[in-house]
Design a protein with these regions (language model features):
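Bacterial Sec-dependent N-terminal signal peptides
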Residues: 1-29
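Pepsin/retropepsin-fold aspartyl endopeptidases
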Residues: 18-398
Length: 398
């Protein structure tokens, strides 16, 4: 599970075989979602409790819940499961949810892994994230992810009229598709990518892949960044601008891709190129048919939206209790560095928009303003209030 915010939280595990009972006889279900800073967030009620916020993640094969939410909803672990989490293989406790309700679907006896808190998601999105839902929920159904309606539809048959069918490869209950990176008008590289709706970038490249093909030097420009996981762990990365990126018949020009630096786990795998993230996926309404190994794409209202390009060179994050917003990093040779902003500054506002949890998505959108946009920052440093101005622009280490 990168763009301005580089979140890569990928869970690759053995699928938990289980018996799941659907209490409703209807075979068509609708789950509303919110798109919060380009994260697909759904509300789930567990064992009759108040709804909790879960991230819908096509790059995960099982459901996760944080330990505090597990305790509050009465979940008790009765077993463990091996899990690759943040590049470490861990034995994690498993519990069984008696009833899980989201939208108009009710599922009984659903296993879930109890894990650490999702602190980093909380501090990025400005809301508490309690868990992640993956292919164990939607894999049994034909699934439509409709960004125009902000709805997920599950059913045995969904109308694919107007959609382009694409064959995918299924490995360990996750699906992969071929995509192409263009480094020039005549040079390109095609390889398989995981569909990952919890990757906040356009695409993230595994280190063995981009190193093998010398992609950093072949990029038009790049800047150093930070990958964030669902916890507080971070790792360095690059955001590199390429001539183009192509997914089947859909081409995207001047795309910034995330070049990861993980030496363990999914992004250390030399058999795949990486992931296709939400900054591309959100531009389509998507139908997923795991049984037939196909996905269907149809451009939606977001297709021509601007890409998430950092034009300030700063990264912001809320503190643990979500009451204050700090500048987490200032990238070199960026407008933020030129304006005099520093890591650790308490950010109070940008262009009179208060930097709080209610506005954190707006604040992050401002850091990705089109080049030439004027931003006025109000910060606090050493108990002194300062006002600083910058003009947004692209920047590069190259």
């Amino acid at each position: 599970m990168v763009k301005d915010i580089s979140i890569l939280f990928l869970v690759i595990i053995c699928f938990i075989s289980c018996s799941t009972n659907i209490s409703a006889t209807n075979l068509s279900y609708t789950i509303p979602f919110q798109l919060i800073d380009d994260m697909v967030v759904i509300d789930i009620s567990i064992n009759g409790t108040s709804p909790l916020h879960f991230i819908f993640d096509t790059g995960t094969t099982t459901s996760l819940i944080d330990s505090i939410s597990a305790q509050k909803t009465g979940l008790i672990s009765d077993d463990t499961q091996g899990l690759l989490l943040n590049n470490d293989f861990l034995e994690m406790p498993i519990a069984k949810i008696k009833t899980l309700k989201t939208g108009n679907i009710v599922i009984e006896n659903r296993p879930v892994i109890i894990t650490q808190s999702f602190e980093n998601y909380n501090r990025i999105l400005g809301i508490p994230i309690h868990g992640i839902i993956g292919s164990d929920l939607f894999g049994k159904y034909i699934t439509e992810l409709n960004f125009d309606k902000s709805q997920i539809h599950l059913g045995r048959g969904i109308d694919t009229t107007g959609y382009e069918p694409i064959n995918v490869r299924i490995y360990n209950d996750l699906f992969y598709i071929d995509a192409t990176i263009f480094t020039s008008d005549t040079d390109s590289i095609t390889n398989q990518f995981l569909f990952d709706s919890a990757d906040m970038t356009a695409a993230s490249l595994a280190q063995p892949f981009w190193t093998k093909h010398n992609l950093l030097s072949k990029s038009k420009s790049f800047y150093s960044g930070i990958n964030r996981s669902s916890s507080s762990l971070t790792s360095p990365s690059y955001f590199a601008n390429f001539k183009g990126f192509k997914l089947r018949n859909y081409s995207f020009k001047n795309t910034y891709l995330n070049l990861t630096s993980s030496k363990r786990g999914f992004f250390a795998n030399d058999s795949i190129a990486g992931t296709i993230g939400i900054d591309i996926l959100k531009r389509f309404n998507i139908i997923i048919n795991m049984n037939n190994q196909k996905i269907y794409l149809k451009p939606n209202q977001k297709y021509n939206e601007p890409y998430r390009i950092n034009t300030t060179g700063l990264r912001t994050r809320l503190n643990k209790d979500l009451t204050q917003c700090f500048i987490e990093a200032v990238l070199q040779q960026s407008p933020a560095e030129a304006a005099g902003l520093l890591q650790g500054d308490l950010l109070l506002s940008i262009n009179d928009i208060k930097a709080n949890k209610e506005n954190i998505s707006k604040i992050r959108q401002l850091t990705r303003s089109i080049p030439g946009t004027k931003l006025v920052f109000v910060i606090q440093r050493n108990n002194e209030i300062k006002e600083m101005t910058m003009i947004c622009n692209t920047f590069s280490d190259k």
